[in-house]
């Protein structure tokens, strides 16, 4: 008995985490619509705190007892704060079975019908305080009801429906209206490949507009219409047109549906057609429509049951409401409506760490701090603190360069990007290998043959102090932002899948990285990087093996599935500079990678920590050699994750950020202890980037700024300053990251980072001007750097040039404008 208990405890400690099988959504009832009989086909609008329900239709007497359908014009407003309904301004006339498209402050209502006819009217309704504001928009080209509509970007799309109550054929038409246009007008777009339909499911996800199921109308023997229930489904994107996706497992006619996150589409119930033709015979004994909730996942192209809802409403609209989805009234069985209103919110579904995971996390992070304490004894001078006494082995320097560039963002994001797309970005990683050649042959000699500590000392020697200080300031400001981001983004991913508090994650990473960097300087940074690279790549390899082991068909099955789904696509053979064409990827990323490898103090500083230039070159070549290996592992892992979750879509957690997919797999599938170690390694990857930034920024501030204005300061004083700066910078970065996680400052922060990102190309352009020209001078170089930022800002905003080419634009503009300006101004200052 004791042995059995110990066995169960052991299994609890080591087995992979499993998410419980509870329904994904938790439902609660809101006050019922004051319309006692309920309504089908109402128009709805909401702003997150209030809900407007207008129009609709119902039967005062059951149709199976001879009753006729009644259209209504009454409207009701629900106040979430008061938790009560009040009467609102009625519609101009009875109306139902139109489409309601949610916008931020209300909705757009499209088409609809009454007892006599269908309508083409389109109106925008806004909830402004206690007032309802109606604005007419251009009417549809044709009257329509029983259709569907969504907003994708700034464009409203309308699909299907029928022209009149007695139509025996459904529309196979697709209309679009750009609501942001100064003079909006409807245009007809190519329709989906399948038949026309009424009452389809239609939802917009990140990758396009989805149209699924519905019912095709066919003439019957009496001259009326009968229905054929459909399960086909399609995706539309303005740039790619229509593509067929996986059929729904059953018909979803008239089902309310909503997007959940950017990749999941939830369908609540719907008429599956199983009792449609039996409805007259069943009459009041009809059991109602299905309660089943289905989840379509766009990345894996799979449908998954997600439990049941407490309602069976059809012909109503699901609208986003606060952090959930709201379903107001609807038809719960043929001829019968329900006034019930339900709000669904996500149940807690995060995986949780087990005891061994916490042990692994604590041991790993403790070891990193121990490294800092160990090397603190050797950091007695600023040369030790900034350059490790120039005694770093070449292989350690190479691993550290690799670890600095492979941030936790990359470690998490690369598999996630491949998981969600294909292998086109393979060449992005391999282009770093190309960048190694000019770095070693052309740049490294200039950095090594003068005994410098800061990379920007070269600019002082080649140009003047103003150029040096401009470059140093640009680097420092950019790194301050980067430090906060490399703490914040991984913390989000880790928190969502492990349950670790996001603020605690940020604090742990920020405090520990600051501690060991302040203690051990660059030597602690380099050796912790070495450990982290080994653990990260080893952990990624283990995760890949586990994923392949759990795949039906193993490695061969993976490649068969991936090839069939075009997930292994690598090359885009086109000259189009707006796409990820082969030449765009290679040429663009050659220049993008030249920016950090030639002008980033955090990277250049590693070149200066080895004994000789030859050893520094060997470190750079080692970094380049590691990239194909790590790229193959991470890209294969991304594809394996896609195949794994395609086979087990029920293991996905809807609504989680795409970048959480790898941490989710770690937490779910790896044994206890192993999962903890790899999650710790993700923490450590953040810390690896942070520690490099802390030390390099402290170096730049001390060497470029403090020494210039306090040249007589003793080395001991400068060392104390460097350690103090490290602590202060760590506190600032951690504080900014905590603010990002606590307050809604995202848009402001994004804007500031975008502005700082404009300076990177100009920074690399300054070094290129200094190394490859003789006549470039300080004033011309600064003009080129400033021009680079403005030109790149214009390119980003006013053109469709692919982002991979931004580095080329930035460096090229600085070089060309800087050289031309040098020929026109202060020619005597050229070197």
Predicted regions and their residues:
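Membrane-embedded helix-loop-helix hairpins and adjacent transmembrane boundary segments
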Residues: 349-831
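Residue-level detector of alpha-helical hydrophobic segments embedded in or interacting with membranes
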Residues: 11, 26-29, 133-136, 153-154, ...
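Kelch-like beta-propeller repeat domains
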Residues: 22-353
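Bacterial N-terminal signal peptides
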Residues: 8-18
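Generic hydrophobic/packing signal
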Residues: 14, 89-95, 104, 111-114, ...
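N-terminal secretory signal peptides that target proteins for export/translocation
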Residues: 1-5
């Amino acid at each position: 008995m004791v042995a059995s208990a110990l066995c169960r405890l052991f299994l609890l400690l080591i087995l992979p985490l499993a998410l419980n099988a509870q329904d994904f959504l938790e439902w609660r009832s809101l006050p019922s619509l004051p319309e006692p009989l309920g309504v089908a086909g109402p128009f709805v609008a909401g702003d997150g705190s209030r809900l407007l329900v207008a129009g609709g239709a119902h039967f005062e007497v059951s149709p199976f007892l001879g009753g006729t359908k009644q259209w209504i014009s009454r409207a009701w407003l629900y106040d979430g704060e008061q938790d009560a309904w009040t009467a609102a301004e009625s519609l101009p006339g009875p109306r139902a079975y139109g489409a309601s498209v949610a916008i931020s402050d209300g909705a757009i209502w499209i088409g609809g019908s009454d007892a006599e006819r269908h309508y083409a009217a389109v109106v925008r309704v806004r909830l402004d305080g206690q007032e309802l504001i109606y604005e007419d928009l251009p009417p549809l080209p044709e009257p329509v009801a029983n259709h569907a509509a969504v907003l994708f970007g700034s464009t409203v799309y309308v699909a299907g429906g029928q022209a009149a109550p007695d139509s025996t054929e459904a529309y196979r038409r697709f209309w679009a209206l750009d609501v942001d246009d100064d003079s909006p007008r409807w245009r007809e777009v190519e329709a989906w490949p399948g038949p026309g339909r009424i009452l389809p499911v239609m939802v917009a996800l990140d990758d396009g507009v989805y149209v699924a199921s519905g019912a095709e109308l066919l003439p019957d023997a009496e001259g009326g219409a009968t229905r054929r229930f459909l399960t086909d489904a399609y995706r539309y994107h303005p740039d790619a047109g229509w593509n067929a996706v996986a059929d729904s497992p059953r018909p979803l006619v008239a089902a309310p549906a909503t997007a959940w996150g950017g990749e999941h589409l939830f369908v609540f119930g719907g008429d599956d057609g199983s009792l449609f033709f039996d409805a007259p015979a069943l009459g009041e004994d009809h059991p109602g429509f299905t309660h089943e909730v289905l989840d379509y996942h766009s990345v894996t192209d799979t449908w998954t049951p997600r439990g049941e809802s407490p309602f069976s409403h059809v012909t109503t609209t699901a609208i986003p409401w606060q952090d959930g989805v709201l379903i107001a009234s609807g038809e719960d069985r043929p001829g019968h409506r329900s006034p019930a209103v339900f709000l669904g919110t996500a149940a807690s579904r995060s995986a949780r760490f087990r005891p061994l995971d916490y042990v692994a996390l604590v041991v790993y992070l403790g070891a990193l701090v121990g490294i800092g304490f160990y090397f603190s004894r050797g950091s007695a001078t600023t040369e030790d603190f900034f350059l490790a006494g120039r005694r770093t082995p070449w292989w350690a320097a190479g691993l550290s360069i690799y670890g600095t560039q492979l941030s936790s963002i990359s470690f998490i994001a690369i598999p996630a990007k491949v998981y969600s797309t294909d292998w086109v970005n393979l060449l992005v990683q391999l282009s770093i290998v190309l960048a190694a050649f000019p770095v070693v042959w052309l740049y490294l000699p200039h950095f090594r043959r003068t005994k410098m500590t800061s990379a920007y000392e070269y600019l002082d020697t080649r140009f003047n102090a103003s150029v040096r200080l401009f470059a140093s300031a640009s680097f420092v400001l950019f790194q301050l932002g980067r430090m906060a981001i490399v703490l914040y983004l991984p913390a989000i991913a880790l928190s969502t899948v492990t349950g670790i508090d996001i603020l605690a994650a940020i604090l742990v990473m920020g405090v520990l990285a600051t501690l060991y960097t302040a203690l051990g300087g660059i030597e602690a940074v380099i050796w912790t990087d070495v450990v982290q690279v080994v653990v990260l790549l080893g952990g990624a390899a283990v995760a890949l093996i586990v994923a392949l082991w759990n795949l039906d068909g193993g490695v061969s099955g993976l490649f068969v599935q991936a090839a069939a789904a075009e997930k292994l696509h690598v090359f885009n053979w086109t000259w189009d500079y707006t796409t990820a064409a082969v030449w765009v990827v290679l040429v663009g990323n050659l220049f993008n990678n030249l920016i950090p490898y030639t002008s980033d103090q955090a990277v250049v500083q590693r070149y200066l920590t080895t004994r000789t230039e030859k050893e520094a070159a060997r470190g750079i070549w080692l970094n380049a050699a590691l990239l194909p290996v790590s790229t193959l592992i991470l890209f294969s892992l991304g594809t394996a994750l896609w195949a794994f979750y395609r086979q087990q879509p029920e293991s996905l957690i809807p609504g989680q950020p795409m970048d959480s997919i790898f941490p989710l797999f770690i937490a779910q599938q790896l044994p206890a202890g192993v999962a903890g170690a790899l999650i710790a390694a993700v923490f450590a990857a953040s810390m690896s980037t942070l520690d490099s930034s802390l030390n390099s920024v402290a170096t730049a501030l001390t060497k470029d700024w403090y020494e210039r204005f306090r040249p007589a300061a003793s080395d001991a004083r400068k060392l104390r300053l460097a350690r103090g700066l490290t602590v202060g910078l760590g506190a600032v970065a951690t504080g900014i990251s905590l603010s990002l996680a606590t307050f809604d400052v995202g848009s402001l922060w994004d804007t500031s980072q975008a502005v700082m990102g404009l300076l990177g190309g100009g920074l690399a352009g300054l070094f290129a001007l200094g190394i490859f020209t003789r006549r470039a001078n300080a004033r011309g170089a600064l003009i080129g750097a400033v021009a680079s930022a403005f030109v790149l800002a214009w390119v980003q905003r006013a053109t469709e040039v692919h982002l991979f080419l931004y580095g080329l634009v930035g460096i090229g503009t600085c070089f060309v404008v800087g050289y031309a300006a040098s020929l026109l101004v202060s020619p005597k200052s050229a070197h």
